[in-house]
């Protein structure tokens, strides 16, 4: 029996953490509980918020306003560079780890807070109330083996968008059992999502809006380039019902030995390319829709990619226990990759359900991101 798309999104809507989390993670992060059923805390100041998230105790934290970190840690003026020129909409770059190389030197001033994310600890739930939960000028950092964390219905924005290396929204550097749901990321200096050089396992990123509309970019226009840099050894990511919009690259850069299951996600308005990466990255894309994407992936990608179609959908049974849903396209480049050698790597992982690509296109852009949790209440 074919399950309606909305029902797929809401299969576990009755399960909640302390009555503030809606739904439950599907895919690789199934079973995550975050802070559990303890009494929620409602921080009023930046200091209270950071203290709660960086504490060693389980916490359920509810955001009811914008927490503005811009200017709270001062600014830095130093030599940076102009890899793409100094035009009004061109990103400049911070010389992190000598990245600038021989590019033209320019003097830059950037905000320090955005470069140093909040180091969230294990057993945490962070949820925004309505559309009010915003982190401005500060991202979230998951490292050192932290686990069992839920982040739902928040927005992260204003991370030095004029400067490469200015700030990442979500950084994962050795984390496990993480669910990022109904979040919006925008105006980042660098990546919306980045995984580092330690394994990041059992992660589900779902119903998120990766908003690439920006003030400065590597293309000197309003399309953000640095979207998702996935380079961890053994990363496991379910990418479900997300909307990647108005970007030009690294959507994702699928490298390391990342295992990436993209299901019912939508890529739209991308004049550059979407998928790139190194030779050991592994990605299965099913039930996804590509709308106005000039290049979805290289014709001969370095990484291992499988794009589901009506012709090859049945071959997914060995990996997913079911046939795949075919991807859909409108005014986009070809995506004919059909590598199946990595399918055995799905063994033991929880697989997200999938609906059709056309249903994803109709539903996901209108219902992803902050302030749209009520979709499952009907």
Swiss-Prot record:
The active site is at 250. Its main location: secreted. Glycans are attached at residue 123. InterPro entries: Pec_lyase, Pectin_lyas_fold, Pectin_lyase_fold/virulence, PEL. One of its GO terms (biological process) is pectin catabolic process. GO terms for molecular function: pectate lyase activity; pectin lyase activity. This is Probable pectin lyase C. Pectinolytic enzymes consist of four classes of enzymes: pectin lyase, polygalacturonase, pectin methylesterase and rhamnogalacturonase. Among pectinolytic enzymes, pectin lyase is the most important in depolymerization of pectin, since it cleaves internal glycosidic bonds of highly methylated pectins. It is found in: Secreted. The keyword Signal applies. Keywords: Carbohydrate metabolism, Cell wall biogenesis/degradation, Disulfide bond, Glycoprotein, Lyase, Polysaccharide degradation, Secreted, Signal. SUPFAM superfamilies: Pectin lyase-like. Disulfide bonds join 81-100, 90-220, 316-324. It catalyses: Eliminative cleavage of (1->4)-alpha-D-galacturonan methyl ester to give oligosaccharides with 4-deoxy-6-O-methyl-alpha-D-galact-4-enuronosyl groups at their non-reducing ends. The keyword Secreted applies. One of its GO terms (cellular component) is extracellular region. Belongs to the polysaccharide lyase 1 family. Its EC number is 4.2.2.10. It holds the Pfam family Pectate_lyase_4. Residues 1-18 form the signal peptide. It comes from Aspergillus niger.
């Amino acid at each position: 029996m074919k399950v309606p798309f909305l029902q797929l999104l809401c299969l576990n809507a009755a399960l909640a953490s302390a009555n503030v989390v809606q739904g439950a993670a599907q895919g690789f992060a199934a079973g995550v509980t975050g802070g559990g059923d303890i009494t929620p805390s409602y921080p009023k100041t930046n200091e209270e918020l950071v203290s709660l998230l960086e504490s060693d105790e389980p916490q359920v934290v509810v955001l009811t306003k914008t927490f503005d970190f811009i200017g709270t840690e001062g600014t830095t003026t130093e030599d940076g560079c102009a890899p793409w020129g100094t035009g009004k909409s061109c990103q400049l770059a911070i010389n992190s780890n000598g990245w600038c190389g021989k590019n033209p030197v320019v003097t830059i001033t950037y905000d320090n807070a955005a470069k140093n994310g909040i180091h969230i600890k294990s057993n945490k739930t962070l949820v925004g109330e309505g559309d009010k939960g915003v982190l401005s000028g500060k991202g979230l950092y998951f490292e050192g083996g932290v686990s069992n964390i839920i982040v739902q219905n928040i927005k992260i924005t204003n991370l030095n968008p004029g400067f490469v290396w200015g700030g990442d929204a979500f950084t994962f550097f050795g984390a496990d059992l993480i669910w990022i749901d109904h979040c919006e990321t925008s105006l980042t200096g660098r990546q919306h999502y980045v995984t580092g050089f330690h394994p990041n396992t059992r992660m589900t990123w779902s119903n998120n809006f990766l908003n690439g509309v920006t003030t400065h970019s590597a293309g000197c226009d309003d399309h953000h380039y640095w979207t998702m840099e996935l380079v961890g050894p053994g990363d496991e990511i379910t990418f479900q019902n997300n909307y990647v919009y108005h970007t030009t690259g690294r959507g994702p850069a699928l490298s390391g030995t990342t295992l990436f299951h993209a299901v019912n996600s939508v890529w739209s308005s991308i004049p550059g390319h979407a998928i790139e990466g190194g030779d050991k990255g592994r990605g299965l894309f099913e039930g996804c829709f590509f709308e106005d994407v000039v290049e979805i992936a290289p014709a001969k990608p370095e990484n291992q990619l499988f794009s589901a179609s009506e012709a090859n959908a049945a071959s997914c049974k060995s990996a997913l226990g079911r046939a795949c849903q075919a991807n859909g396209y409108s005014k986009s480049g070809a995506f004919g990759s059909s590598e199946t050698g990595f399918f055995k790597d799905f063994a033991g992982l929880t697989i997200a359900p999938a609906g059709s690509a056309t249903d994803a296109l109709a539903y996901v852009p209108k219902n992803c991101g902050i302030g749209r949790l009520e979709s499952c209440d009907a």
